Amino acid sequence: MSSRKSKNNSLIHTECLSQVQRILRERFCHQSPHSNLFGVQVQYKHLSELLKRTALHGESNSVLIIGPRGSGKTMLINHALKELMEIEEVSENVLQVHLNGLLQINDKIALKEITRQLNLENVVGDKVFGSFAENLSFLLEALKKGDRTSSCPVVFILDEFDLFAHHKNQTLLYNLFDISQSAQTPVAVIGLTCRLDILELLEKRVKSRFSHRQIHLMNSFGFPQYVKIFKEQLSLPAEFPDKVFAEKWNENVQYLSEDRSVQEVLQKHFNISKNLRSLHMLLMLALNRVTASHPFMTAVDLIEASQLCSMDSKANIVHGLSVLEICLIIAMKHLNDIYEEEPFNFQMVYNEFQKFVQRKAHSVYNFEKPVVMKAFEHLQQLELIKPMERTSGNSQREYQLMKLLLDNTQIMNALQKYPNCPTDVRQWATSSLSWL
């Protein structure tokens, strides 16, 4: 009887954990509109009112949301649109068009995407239009039910807005802003960009039709607020089916937020970047360690997740190099120390390596020059070194100037973790100014 009971408990636990994983992953990955906004309530109110004026009163508007990557621009617009669509008279009437500068790389593709999202492919058919403006006006005209007050408002969201400014003649931007200034179909044009100088990219005729409304997001919260965000992002909602499990989970999250080692991890991430995406990545990696046998997150999970986040990819490449390639990197390190970061060539590295070989007076590291050259070229392929300028067909490879893309700290840290690194190689790396 007891074994059956424990089996049932285990199944309940597994089911709870799968729900926890689903809820939190959705929160971390998709920044769903169900998550909370942090420190942008004023901006949210401004944007929400602007959208309501378009949807409810037929007032056309344009606005730019400006902020660094990960500051919450997409999350802000998603929240505002979700709230707007919850209004009964709006949900059936307002149309949304989402464009992205990375996908719609010219105005022709953008216009096709607008037609598709407005479900007007059948209306357009095989019609031939004289200009882009005529085509766009026809699309919006097709949405009208009668006069201006009964027209379908359209919300245009332009992600990576600065990339649209590079389109030929900025035709799309000109026509969208022109419609937002005229008494045609009510539209709201919302641009999302991380460039502060975005207005400098706009042509004079485009700029004159833009309302010059700007909403800035700057991640201005402090560390206490960052810890609060950490708690809110990990906590389970009140409507979670298993109340007992949710209470235990949330108590554990509260305990973690007060743990000194966890606070050190969070402080480190906060100092590097206030970007919530980096926090989500940390939490996602820690969440991956939660299983039926390990149902609650621990400080160790977060510490190990932090180490994965801050892992140096170039140092990891060094761990997989041959001893000869390691020796060449150490030779480059010494050349950088001697010549104060001046570029070097293969011949200089080879000479430095030969000094080491002759000093050790044994044949373990005594490779033929073509073999050393092959190892040098492999380092270039791995992008641990790079040429200072393009090579011409006439130039000799061994005299091409190179630059090392690893600093001394990275090299020494990688050597400490290098499996079975020979003692004399490690000593050579730590010696000052080579063997001079």
UniProtKB/Swiss-Prot annotation:
One of its GO terms (molecular function) is ATP binding. This is Origin recognition complex subunit 4. Its main location: nucleus. Belongs to the ORC4 family. ATP binds at G67, P68, R69, G70, S71, G72, K73, T74. GO terms for biological process: DNA replication initiation; polar body extrusion after meiotic divisions; protein polymerization. The modification N6-methyllysine is found at K7.
